[in-house]
Structures are given as structure tokens and as C-alpha cells.
Design a protein with these regions (language model features):
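Membrane-proximal intracellular helices of multi-pass ion channels
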Residues: 1-240
Length: 240
């Protein structure tokens, strides 16, 4: 009887931890949805209706899925996070969210399948700089803007994960002992452990991005080119 109760408690705790992971993953999806608004606007203004349709589909699905994840994890969102939970959510951000991010990429000329779009999205969000879009000059502005935004968002996530996930383990020699970025309560939730460094890093990241766009535009480049080059530069993806 005790063993049965213990197994039931362990199962309930596992479900609670899964809920906390899904809740945090939902916020990552919400960030993707917000970023999709930019290339959707570019598609409408430029008359790229095929891209506008894909971005509308992607935005709708991403918003729905993200909302469902957040709602499903609400009851367990305050569960204290373990270090393994931080590592798990980092992997989910990098390899699950690209499924949603790849939907608009399927209308790109050089993306021949959904798996190719997924690979492109993973490459951008992990800031690896790879991908299947080798000749950006053949792609329309909405695709280039979306690829730049994915790399930019991936760069932001990489900085946050470096502080919240890698630094506590001193992975790669990274150590921020005593830094206010690592300060948190012992019973801090997963969303709180990631949210604190996000709130500190994001304003500087955004400010540098805006300065980069202004600098590129001042050099005589068009707005879309300046936007894409600035975002790829700040994120470190190196795409154009």
C-alpha cells in the first residue's frame, strides 16, 4: 500500500514538473508569435500574399499552441525548479519550438520540404549559422526578415540560457558566481529562473539591435537589408 502511494506521489510530481516545463515553453512560443507579426506586416505591405498566408497560418497555430501550453501549466507554474529542468527546457526551446517557426519557411524558394524548413529554423534559433537558404538574394523580403528574427531571438535565448543554465554548472568555463543575474530564491520556479536574466539582458540586447539598424541604414543600405544585417550581427548567426 505504501509503495502504491509512493508511486502515485512520484507520478503526480512528474506531471507537475511537466506542467511547469510546458508553461515556460508556452512563453517561448508566445515570443515566436510576436516576432511573426513583423514579417507578416512586411508580406502585406510588399504584396507577398503567399507569404502572408503562411505567416497567418503560422501565427494562428503558434498563438493557439502557446496559449494551450501556458494554460495547461498554470496550476504547477510555481513548482521549484531543479537544474535538470533548466536543461530540459533549453532543449525544448531549441528543438520543439522550431516546429512552429518552420511553418512560414515552407514558402521559401530554397526550402523544398517541411524538414528542410525545420532544419533552417533550428539552425537560426541555435545561432549555428547553417541552414538550407544558401543564396538569400533569391528569397523575398518576408523570408529574409523572418530568418533574421529567428536568429535574433535565438541569440537572446542563448544569452539567457548561458546565464541561467550553463553558468551554474560552469560549463565551458563560464562562471558568474556572485552575479546578480544568478540570484534567485531557493524555491524559485522555472519561469522565474529564466525570467530574471531575461529582464536584465533584453533591454541592452534590444538597444544594441536598434543602434545596429540605425548604423546600417546610415551607411546607405535599404531598411530590410539594414534590419537583417543588424539582427544577424547582434545574434552572431552571420547570415545576410
Amino acid at each position: 500500500c505504501r509503495a502504491s502511494v509512493s508511486c502515485q506521489s512520484a507520478e503526480e510530481l512528474a506531471n507537475m514538473r511537466l506542467g511547469a516545463l510546458l508553461y515556460t515553453l508556452g512563453y517561448g512560443g508566445a515570443m515566436l508569435a510576436l516576432c511573426m507579426l513583423v514579417p507578416l506586416f512586411v508580406s502585406i505591405v510588399g504584396g507577398h500574399w503567399a507569404h502572408a498566408r503562411n505567416f497567418t497560418m503560422g501565427l494562428t497555430l503558434t498563438t493557439f499552441v502557446s496559449g494551450a501550453l501556458i494554460i495547461s501549466g498554470l496550476p504547477t507554474r510555481r513548482l521549484p525548479a531543479r537544474n535538470i529542468d533548466l536543461l530540459a527546457v533549453m532543449l525544448l526551446f531549441w528543438f520543439v519550438l522550431p516546429i512552429l517557426a518552420s511553418i512560414p519557411l515552407t514558402s521559401a524558394i530554397q526550402v523544398r520540404s517541411f524538414m528542410a524548413g525545420y532544419f533552417e529554423a533550428v539552425s537560426s534559433l541555435t545561432t549555428s549559422g547553417g541552414g538550407v537558404i544558401i543564396y538569400p538574394q533569391f528569397e523575398d523580403a518576408p523570408i529574409l526578415v523572418w530568418r533574421a528574427l529567428l536568429g535574433w531571438l535565438g541569440g537572446l535565448w542563448t544569452l539567457v540560457f548561458a546565464v541561467a543554465v550553463l553558468a551554474p554548472f560552469a560549463i565551458g568555463g563560464l562562471s558568474l558566481v556572485g552575479s546578480p543575474l544568478l540570484q534567485h530564491d531557493e524555491d524559485a520556479a522555472l519561469s522565474s529562473r529564466l525570467g530574471r536574466p531575461m529582464r536584465v539582458i533584453f533591454p541592452y540586447y534590444l538597444a544594441l539591435t536598434i543602434l545596429g539598424v540605425i548604423g546600417m541604414a546610415a551607411g546607405g543600405n535599404g531598411f530590410v537589408s539594414s534590419f537583417c544585417m543588424a539582427l544577424s550581427g547582434i545574434s552572431g548567426t552571420g547570415t545576410s
